[in-house]
Amino acid sequence: MQSFVLMIIMANVPTVAFSNGHKMPMLGLGTAKSKNKDAARAVKEAIDLGYRHIDTAFFYGNEKEIGEAIREKIEDGCVTREDLFITTKLWNNCHKEEHVVPACEKSLANLGLKYLDLYLVHWPFALKEGDNLIPQDKSGNLIESDVDYVETWRGMEECVHQGLTRSIGISNFNSEQISRLLESAKIAPVNNQIEVNINLNQEKLVDICKKRNITVTGYCPLGHPGNALGIENKLDSSVMLNIAKKHNKTPAQIALRYVFQKEVAPIPKSITKSRIKENIEIFDFTLTSDEMNAIRKLGTGERVVDFAKAKNFKYFPFNIPF
């Protein structure tokens, strides 16, 4: 069973140790859909506020801006590279083994870094190779590639061998895919990044990851407030409002604390300084077991991110419960 021995760093953000000994801050800044100057500004403000864990991906299209922000904060003496934990992800059109190292090198060049702290396989299924990140046929259907993620993983392991990244992991992998990958992996994944929030608590998958010594990072930890997906915003529920009032916190802070107390590292996305500050102020209180159970009962299992256009692909991860 994985030991979640937590150490305290700046801004009182705990860290968790990977199976390989490296450590990851248990809260980070998510940057999906944060573009250009917004992404750079958010990263700089986050670092000033005590964030040390920054999450991005090649698919987000903001690696260069994030890299510029990181360099600026290093140059002004706010942090050193060793203080930071930087994650990015391999996109689906580069799943062939021989494409993985070049893709990692491209992300490093974009970020202006010599190494990554964590490199993830963004999704278990592959898309047609080429420059188009979302390849589609004339009917608008996604074009699948038949590359097996087991092959992709060999390329990920080579990234470690070449010193391009300290750790490697997966994202959006289900329990069966994790088991199959571990059967052949020479370097085990240290992390699985999945959607985790009060609506989708992922208890069974998180438990499986823990038993396999795989840490979990939670994206969309606030669900999708104000979204157009038809998913009820549980942050406004009486349960969340009452718990927030008791702790003198916001419902969003309660939601993030809930994810954290499940031993999942939330990576909330924001480009608003006040919210970035609010999101890191979750380590000075604790939810009771009754409060955790009350929040747990709010879940319906609905996903914000379902990538439904790929639901018929061989390695689509969401066709089983977990």
Where are these regions (language model features)?
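N-terminal amphipathic/basic-hydrophobic helices that include classical n-h-c signal peptides
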Residues: 1-9
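N-terminal binding-site loop/beta-alpha segment at the start of enzyme catalytic domains
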Residues: 8-84, 98-102, 114, 221-226, ...
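Residues embedded in well-ordered beta-strands within globular domains across many folds
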Residues: 28, 55-58, 117-120, 169, ...
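Short acidic/polar active-site loop segments enriched in Thr and Asp
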Residues: 52, 114-117, 166, 190
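CE4/NodB-like, metal-dependent polysaccharide N-deacetylase domain
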Residues: 100-121, 158-162
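Beta/alpha (TIM)-barrel catalytic core signal, keyed to glycine-rich beta->alpha loops juxtaposed to Asp/Glu
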Residues: 125-322
